Amino acid sequence: MDTVGSVKRQGTQRVGFLLMDQFTLVSLSSAIDPLRVANSLSDVELYRWCLIGAGEEEQISSDGVRVKLDHTLTDEIELDLVIVV
């Protein structure tokens, strides 16, 4: 059985989280946290993520929290996976 340290690595996976209007913070944190934990258990960076939205600089969650975006929909970025939140 493979362990975290023995899994064959194919490079850092680039994950984009597309934040919809009124997204829920619990969904976002539930999606990011396993990636963060995997990185902390590994000797290398397995995942890198960014936040994407339609707004200019921030997206507002369903409970009114403003989240700073890393990119907007018009930015050209290379990702391996996009998760819609």
Language-model features: locations:
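Extended, subdomain-level signal for the structured scaffold at the beginning of enzyme domains
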Residues: 1-85
